[in-house]
């Protein structure tokens, strides 16, 4: 008897899967401990002290109690993904320290996760509010530390609470019972006033005062609204997740007189919790710290040993030095755009990124025959408003500064994640009026190159490009419908119906091109579902000439989602999908399996692509399915369009009519093959001086995307890259955190190269890795939780 009979072959589980399963029991214990911390209660602090007249620099308010749990570990060890266990088992507010971290969590949890800044009410106008320089005095208690941290951030805090008091009614939840409050928590998303468990991913990138700000806003909001959390004295539990050795926190103060940023290192939230003895004792760090040990992103044992060496600041063995030498290639190969095509270059400085992109664009522009990697330019417009700019110049004593000089010195501040600092762009024109000065830059993009978003951006999905088989797989899987139907499913079914309606012609066109009369005859004879039939009877179609697709003589246009009921839209979509699949099966029978993999495109309107990048149409505008684009997904740049795109904003376009005429919408393709237009990014630059004077100086319009061809190591944090080429350049005394972040982006050690051995250039010692000694101490402490 065959021993395999009745057995099912199973794939061997991956090392990453095994590592995740072995950590399951310890993760459960972490959840239980955080649950216990969240049940701690106290006498509610009297928040009436903290009014708009209060100033912690001069006044002493009541101490705001809190608890904390720290989750740290090597890069790729599963810290962020383990947050899903908290999300599934506890009522908690999940946040990220950055937009990338928040979007990463949102995708993993399939639930909206804000940044911690958004959670406590931070707005764009607060970016340029200067932090106060608080005199440093000896802080010997947790109360003194909290007061000091709160005083640093108080100008921003007061502006946020002023707006909150204006928008929220005092005592709004005073009459709400405990059961009604629990129902409210389940109905809506988590907030600082619906949960006392606040999770912050990538907390090591936050300045230490943000921890105190979160604690303050938790108590203030719950006190103002008079929630059951406040009445019961529920102490907030702040869960801080991150890797203290791969992150640094910096604070920047803009010097208006010299027009430059003054950047200095500061304590981050993790080192604040680990390194401040008063804080560590208060939160009982030994019992409330979990360390993830093994890297699950890249499971190569030697690579994991490298990360642990950097994590714990261990001595570098000759064997490890030899291992890193295997990744070293000549610097000229990494800087040559023709080498390592498709790999992501990582650099230390923005100038190095910009130089590489400029070299790449020069190579592409000299190759006129390259269609798939065509280089094209789009304008970026900065508009400086004359009146507030003149007032600002007088206030800072720079009366001779011109708008162009100001824009040149402030480009890096005009867009998220220093997009302007990385772009290969140059001034191509200025337009001066009495009201403003418009400065136009030309920025370059490469067709079919990968890019990520630099902020929260709307997209209008307007088409699909790929193969017939790929499109059919998407329709059969219905994942697209599931992932986009949470707001209004009617629009999703209407969108797909429009794509299907317009896609039918491709079968007829292929038959005509091939001169295949039998296929065209069979195509006409395919039955059309009753849900698609227009008011014109089938008899009216008989006798029509065969020079057009009979489907369009028979079928009605897809019903509008604003006028048709959902069942009608679903019925039309089902009928259109059935007919598309029948036509595809017919084409496969006549033309063979290769037809399934042939080129296929469909759009919501008739589109023609000129010069390979310019999407044009005779339609007055471009419509589609509007959604927010994910900042962690990678998009392929396809080109641009000057067609007016409807992004679903009731107030109209975010750009002025003048800027809209100058700036097109960038067209991209996602990993599934769907084509979308991205809404242009609008940045309003507001300068806030120390005295509180505010000047609305500038408005800039750009495209909100950043090339994945090259980026800084700092920007790459939190991103997994399939192919990585790192250039450490001519830098010396490289920070250990930069080396750690750079090499740990790789998901496969076989696809990692670098231009030098960073271990020979890296600063060593406790000063460079201050948290390593605390981590090593924790590894030897039986009270801490180790997760392998």
Swiss-Prot record:
Name the residues that bind ATP. 73-80
Annotated keywords: ATP-binding, DNA replication, Helicase, Host nucleus, Hydrolase, Nucleotide-binding
GO BP field: bidirectional double-stranded viral DNA replication; DNA replication
This entry carries the following GO cellular component terms, namely: host cell nucleus
- List the molecular function annotations (GO) for this entry: ATP binding; helicase activity; hydrolase activity
An example of a Pfam family matching this protein is: Herpes_Helicase
Where it sits in the cell: the answer is: Host nucleus
EC number of the protein: 3.6.4.-
This molecule's function is given as:
Component of the helicase/primase complex. Unwinds the DNA at the replication forks and generates single-stranded DNA for both leading and lagging strand synthesis. The primase synthesizes short RNA primers on the lagging strand that the polymerase elongates using dNTPs. Possesses helicase-like motifs and therefore may act as the helicase subunit of the complex.
* Membership in a protein family: Belongs to the herpesviridae helicase family.
The subunit field of the Swiss-Prot or TrEMBL record says: Associates with the primase and the primase-associated factor to form the helicase-primase complex.
UniProt name for this protein:
DNA replication helicase
């Amino acid at each position: 008897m065959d021993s395999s009979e009745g057995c099912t072959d199973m794939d061997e589980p991956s090392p990453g899967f095994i590592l995740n399963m072995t950590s399951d029991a310890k993760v459960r214990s972490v959840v239980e401990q955080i649950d216990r911390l969240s049940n701690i209660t106290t006498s509610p602090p009297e928040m009436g002290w903290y009014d708009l007249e209060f100033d912690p620099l001069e006044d002493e308010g009541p101490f705001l109690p809190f608890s904390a749990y720290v989750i740290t570990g090597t890069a790729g060890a599963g810290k962020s993904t383990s947050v899903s266990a908290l999300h599934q088992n506890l009522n908690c507010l999940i946040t990220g320290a950055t937009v990338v971290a928040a979007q990463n969590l949102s995708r993993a949890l399939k639930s909206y996760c804000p940044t911690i800044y958004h959670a406590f009410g931070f707005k764009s106008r607060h970016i340029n509010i200067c932090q106060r320089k608080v005199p440093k005095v000896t802080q010997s208690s947790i109360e003194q530390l909290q007061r000091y941290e709160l005083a640093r951030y108080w100008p921003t805090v007061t502006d946020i609470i002023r707006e909150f008091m204006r928008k929220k009614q005092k005592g709004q939840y005073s009459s709400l019972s405990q059961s009604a409050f629990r129902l409210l928590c389940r109905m809506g998303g988590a907030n600082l006033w619906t949960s006392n468990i606040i999770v912050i991913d990538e907390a090591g990138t936050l300045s230490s005062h943000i921890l105190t700000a979160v604690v303050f806003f938790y108590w203030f909001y719950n006190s103002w609204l008079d929630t059951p959390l406040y009445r019961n004295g529920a102490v907030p539990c702040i869960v801080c997740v991150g890797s203290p050795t791969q992150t640094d926190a910096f604070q920047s103060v803009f010097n208006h007189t010299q027009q430059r940023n003054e950047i200095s290192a500061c304590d981050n939230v993790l080192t604040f919790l680990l390194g401040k003895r008063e804080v560590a004792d208060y939160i009982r760090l030994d019992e409330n710290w979990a360390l993830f040990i093994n890297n699950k992103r890249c499971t190569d044992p030697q690579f994991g040993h490298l990360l642990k060496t950097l994590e714990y600041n261990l001595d570098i063995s000759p064997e490890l030095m030899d291992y890193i030498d295997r990744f070293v290639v000549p610097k000229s190969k990494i800087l040559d755009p023709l080498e390592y095509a498709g790999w992501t270059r990582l650099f230390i400085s923005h100038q190095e990124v910009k130089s590489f992109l400029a070299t790449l664009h020069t190579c592409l522009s000299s190759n006129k025959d390259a269609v798939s990697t065509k280089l094209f330019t789009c304008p970026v417009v900065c508009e400086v408003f004359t009146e507030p700019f003149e007032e600002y110049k007088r206030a800072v004593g720079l009366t001779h500064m011109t708008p162009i000089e100001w824009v040149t010195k402030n480009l890096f501040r005009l867009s998220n994640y220093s997009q302007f600092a990385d772009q290969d762009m140059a001034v191509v024109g200025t337009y001066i009026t009495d009201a403003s000065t418009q400065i136009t830059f030309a920025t370059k993009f490469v067709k079919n190159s990968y890019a990520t978003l630099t902020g929260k951006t709307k997209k209008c999905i307007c088409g699909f490009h790929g193969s017939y088989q790929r499109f059919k797989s998407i329709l059969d899987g219905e994942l697209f419908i599931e992932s986009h139907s949470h707001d209004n499913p009617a629009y999703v079914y209407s969108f797909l119906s429009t794509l299907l309606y317009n896609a039918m012609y491709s079968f007829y066109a292929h038959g005509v091109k091939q001169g295949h009369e039998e296929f065209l005859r069979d195509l006409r004879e395919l039955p059309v579902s009753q849900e698609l039939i227009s008011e014109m009877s089938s008899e009216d179609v008989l006798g029509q000439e065969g020079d057009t697709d009979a489907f369009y003589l028979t079928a009605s246009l897809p019903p509008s989602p604003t006028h048709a009921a959902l069942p009608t839209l679903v019925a039309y979509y089902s009928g259109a999908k059935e007919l598309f699949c029948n036509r595809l099966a017919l084409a496969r029978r006549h033309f063979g399996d290769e037809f399934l993999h042939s080129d296929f495109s469909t759009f919501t309107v008739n589109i023609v692509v000129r010069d390979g990048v310019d999407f044009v149409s005779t339609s007055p505008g471009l419509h589609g399915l509007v959604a927010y684009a994910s900042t962690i997904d990678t998009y392929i740049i396809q080109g641009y369009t000057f067609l007016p795109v409807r992004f679903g904003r009731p107030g109209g376009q975010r750009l002025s009519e003048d800027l809209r005429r100058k700036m097109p919408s960038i067209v991209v393709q996602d990993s599934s093959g769907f084509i979308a237009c991205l809404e242009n990014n609008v940045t309003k630059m507001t300068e806030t001086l120390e005295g509180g004077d505010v000047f609305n100086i500038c408005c800039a319009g750009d495209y909100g995307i950043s090339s994945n061809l090259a980026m800084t190591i700092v920007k790459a944090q939190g991103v997994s890259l399939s192919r990585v080429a790192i250039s450490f350049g001519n830098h010396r005394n490289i920070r250990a955190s930069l080396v750690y972040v750079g090499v740990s982006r790789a998901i496969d050690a076989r696809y990692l190269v670098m231009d030098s051995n960073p271990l020979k250039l890296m600063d060593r010692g406790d000063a460079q890795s201050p948290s390593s000694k605390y981590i090593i101490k924790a590894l030897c402490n039986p009270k801490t939780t180790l997760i392998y």
